Amino acid sequence: MRFSTALSLALAVSPAAVFAAGNLGFSLGVKRPDGQCKDQADFEKDFDTLKAHGTTVRTYAAADCGSASLILPAAKSKGFKVVLGIWPDVEESYKADVDALKKAVPGNEDVVAAITVGSETLYRGNFTGPELLKKIKEVQKVFPKITIGTADSWNKYADGTADALIEGGVKYLLVNAFAFWQGKAIEQAPKTLFDDLVGAAKRIADKAPQGSSPYVAIGETGWPTDGGTDYGAAKAGTKNAEKFYKEGVCAMLAWGVDAFYFEAFDEPWKPKSIGDNGNAADETHWGMYTADRKPKFNADCKVNKKKD
């Protein structure tokens, strides 16, 4: 595909960024459709559904719903790996998440793919790059054998906001890229996804310490299905979501880029949020699956997955 060729050429001049095997992962909520907390059995059912596509999920705040202590044994029983999250924006949540991980991780290190400190923290302006780097280093000291990193919007890598993290040697960098929230029509959305990743990856490669190879993957991308809210030229709908998935996400996987799809299942408990345009936006219809784990579209990329 031309997008893949363009991405390959863009990164060929900046070889420090290393992409993995093109595996699909999912952002996974920790609450049931009614807003109650999931238990271990719920996570196991989630994994049974998702294993047809991939065996990695990411969450955002380890203490939320006591999720870390529940999802790790579920992952171990089903052959999954988990990217656990720490929410550092508020000191209370930061400490609670670290404490939750201190209890949950020992004995389950084999199913912890990484720990992310923050999700779009730089994008929201809650930390500077140096401030977030300090938090990441604090967590790395607590979990010396676990890969520690962060996730942020593609433009915060591309515009230099995240330079301190890259230059500081952070080894795990997730790049969130939503053509939908950039207001792109579906016809332009797959190319926008590639352009976003190229912009972030080139900056990461240029700023990474000599000899280092930070792991770079798409941390979040997706498209709302039927029932979702439009955003400018970006129109919600299941057909558009499938098109974006097949022409954008699947193409990335075919090229060899790992990607986390946002999200695994609808979350009907979520309240509306206010977008950058000031309008209320629905966040309950972003799942590849409905809240009761029914598929919305055929998610078979027809690409060969690398064996672990």
From Swiss-Prot:
UniProt keyword Coiled coil present: no
GO biological process entries: carbohydrate metabolic process; cell wall organization
Location in or out of the cell: Secreted; Secreted, Cell wall; Cytoplasm
GO CC annotation, single: cytoplasm
EC number from the UniProt entry: 3.2.1.58
Keywords assigned: Allergen, Cell wall, Cytoplasm, Glycoprotein, Glycosidase, Hydrolase, Secreted, Signal
Active site per the UniProt annotation: E120 (proton donor), E220 (nucleophile)
Glycosylation sites: N126
InterPro entries linked to this entry: Beta-glucan_modifiers, Glyco_hydro_17, Glycoside_hydrolase_SF
Broad class of where this protein is predominantly found: secreted
Induction conditions: Expression is down-regulated in presence of human keratinocytes.
Signal peptide residue numbers: 1-20
Pfam families reported in the protein's UniProt record: Glyco_hydro_17
Reaction catalyzed: Successive hydrolysis of beta-D-glucose units from the non-reducing ends of (1->3)-beta-D-glucans, releasing alpha-glucose
Function, as annotated: Cell wall glucan 1,3-beta-glucosidase involved in cell wall biosynthesis and virulence. Crucial for delivery of beta-1,3-glucan to the biofilm matrix and for accumulation of mature matrix biomass.
Family classification: Belongs to the glycosyl hydrolase 17 family.
Protein name: Glucan 1,3-beta-glucosidase ARB_02797
Organism: Arthroderma benhamiae (strain ATCC MYA-4681 / CBS 112371)
